[in-house]
């Protein structure tokens, strides 16, 4: 603990700049027009404003807490904690997979490097770094990469607009809106109030809710902040001021520029996820600009992957190794185990990334919302409501996950199944938790949390 808020703010911004932030928001721009990047931005930001009061409340109620599963263990018991542990690891694995897939697509699109090589080598690099440096290494490395990403964005966007011409982009978008024969035909492409874009924005809230609230990396950064005031300042600056402009720009500039030229999936692009690298390669050729863009995506993937792996270290060390493998483990033994598990998790991710060659980053992200949104209601309720019982928590998670998956696979309309599936995954558990708690006779004593002492050192 005791890391300054300025460092945490930079770290939050960079660790939330995923390959999906750059390439997925560009894909959203292709799909939903000028509203795509905007809806990506606000949808993915809202969960941080759920996380901030949650962590502030947790610091007050449970001062010695270092992982969210420690809280779950004390609040709901060991059984429910194991379930949340699985979800927490699942989020980490998914996010790492998304980074590997994105980096692999960029290296392949820009330089013709085999997808498998471009995806695996960066994962190997960040694994070795985090295994040696841990969380503090992750945060200070984030600061360096914060400046690299910012500089590349500031330089590249004006050059792209100058190369393509604002008038040409606008005229191309008008054709997208008015010409049914256009490969990207979308009557709402020039509307900020696009219905499809707004549905995607709501879906983005659901997707990010699970990714943020179940990602131990964000808890680790928040807990490492010097004070509650610094925490609030760091997360507001890191998300609203520093992060939100990036997907708005990527969706508007990369995504809309591509569709304005009549280029789309199957019509110049093998995948819609290639929109961002396509436009950069068009403008820069294979020169310095292309190298800059690859560097930016590489940095985004590295920092996000680093944050995930540091979170995996914390979860496995505090909530698995110490409890179930070696209860008498020293701090040194726990750290050694944490380094080993970093390599194991990364190895599994590398295999999955290779198998996902050719998949859309945006659709991967949307589907992940169904998987990880279900536990968030019981997590939030557990922080504030004493009448939410372990049985209610588990039942809500099972129902939310089942309803979301059923909707996604049963609804035949692919333009709406992802939206309904995500909403059900979030709202069904919320309704069950609220109604169940109202009629529950269970009561939890929150005073127990203040006396909690972890089995590992808290500095």
Predicted feature locations:
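Membrane-interface helix-loop-helix modules in multi-pass membrane proteins
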Residues: 1-64, 206-207, 218-265, 281-304
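Transmembrane helix-loop boundary segments of multi-pass membrane transporters
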Residues: 27-42, 100-116, 136-145, 332-338, ...
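Helix-loop-helix module between adjacent transmembrane segments
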Residues: 38-131, 203-208, 299-307, 338
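Hydrophobic, small-residue-rich membrane helices and short re-entrant helix-turn-helix hairpins
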Residues: 63-73, 134-144, 214-247, 265-268, ...
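Loop-to-transmembrane helix boundary motifs in multi-pass membrane proteins
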Residues: 75-82, 93, 314-357
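Selective recognition of specific alpha-helical transmembrane segments in multi-pass small-molecule
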Residues: 86-98, 148-162, 198-213, 228-261, ...
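Hydrophobic alpha-helical segments and their helix-loop junctions in multi-pass secondary transporters
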Residues: 92-100, 104, 110-121, 125-131, ...
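Terminal cytosolic tails of multi-pass membrane transporters
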Residues: 322-323, 414-459
């Amino acid at each position: 603990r005791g890391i300054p808020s300025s460092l945490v703010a930079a770290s939050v911004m960079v660790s939330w700049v995923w390959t999906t932030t750059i390439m997925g928001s560009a894909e959203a721009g292709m799909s939903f027009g000028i509203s795509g990047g905007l809806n990506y931005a606000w949808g993915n930001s809202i969960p941080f404003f759920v996380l901030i009061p949650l962590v502030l409340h947790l610091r007050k109620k449970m001062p010695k807490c270092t992982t969210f599963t420690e809280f779950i263990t004390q609040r709901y018991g060991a059984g429910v904690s194991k379930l949340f542990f699985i979800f927490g690891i699942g989020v980490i694995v998914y996010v790492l997979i998304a980074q590997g897939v994105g980096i692999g697509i960029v290296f392949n699109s820009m330089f013709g490097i085999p997808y498998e090589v471009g995806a695996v080598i960066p994962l190997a690099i960040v694994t070795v770094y985090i295994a040696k440096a841990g969380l503090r290494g992750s945060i200070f490395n984030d600061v360096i990469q914060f400046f690299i990403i910012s500089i590349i964005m500031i330089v590249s966007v004006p050059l792209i607009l100058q190369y393509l011409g604002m008038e040409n982009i606008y005229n191309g978008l008008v054709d997208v809106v008015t010409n049914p024969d256009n490969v990207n035909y979308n009557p709402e492409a020039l509307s900020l109030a696009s219905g499809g874009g707004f549905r995607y924005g709501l879906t983005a809230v659901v997707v990010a809710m699970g990714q943020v609230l179940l990602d131990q990396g964000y808890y680790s950064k928040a807990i490492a902040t010097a004070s509650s005031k610094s925490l609030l300042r760091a997360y507001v600056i890191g998300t609203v001021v520093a992060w939100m402009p990036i997907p708005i720009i990527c969706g508007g500039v990369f995504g809309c520029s591509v569709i304005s030229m009549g280029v789309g999936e199957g019509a110049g692009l093998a995948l819609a996820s290639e929109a961002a690298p396509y436009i950069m390669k068009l403008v820069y050729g294979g020169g310095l600009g292309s190298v800059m863009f690859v560097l930016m995506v590489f940095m985004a993937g590295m920092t996000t992957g680093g944050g995930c792996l540091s979170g995996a270290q914390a979860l496995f060390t505090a909530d698995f190794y110490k409890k179930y493998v070696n209860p008498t483990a020293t701090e040194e033994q726990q750290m050694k185990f944490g380094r080993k598990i970093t390599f194991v998790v990364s190895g599994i991710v590398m295999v999955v990334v290779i198998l996902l060659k050719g998949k859309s980053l945006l659709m991967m992200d949307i589907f992940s919302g169904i998987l990880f949104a279900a536990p968030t209601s019981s997590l939030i309720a557990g922080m504030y409501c004493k009448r939410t019982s372990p049985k209610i928590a588990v039942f809500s998670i099972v129902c939310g996950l089942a309803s979301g998956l059923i909707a996604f696979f049963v609804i035949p309309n692919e333009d709406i199944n992802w939206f309904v599936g995500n909403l059900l995954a979030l709202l069904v558990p919320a309704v069950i938790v609220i109604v169940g708690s109202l009629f529950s006779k269970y009561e939890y004593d929150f005073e127990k949390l203040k006396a909690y002492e972890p089995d590992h050192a808290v500095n």
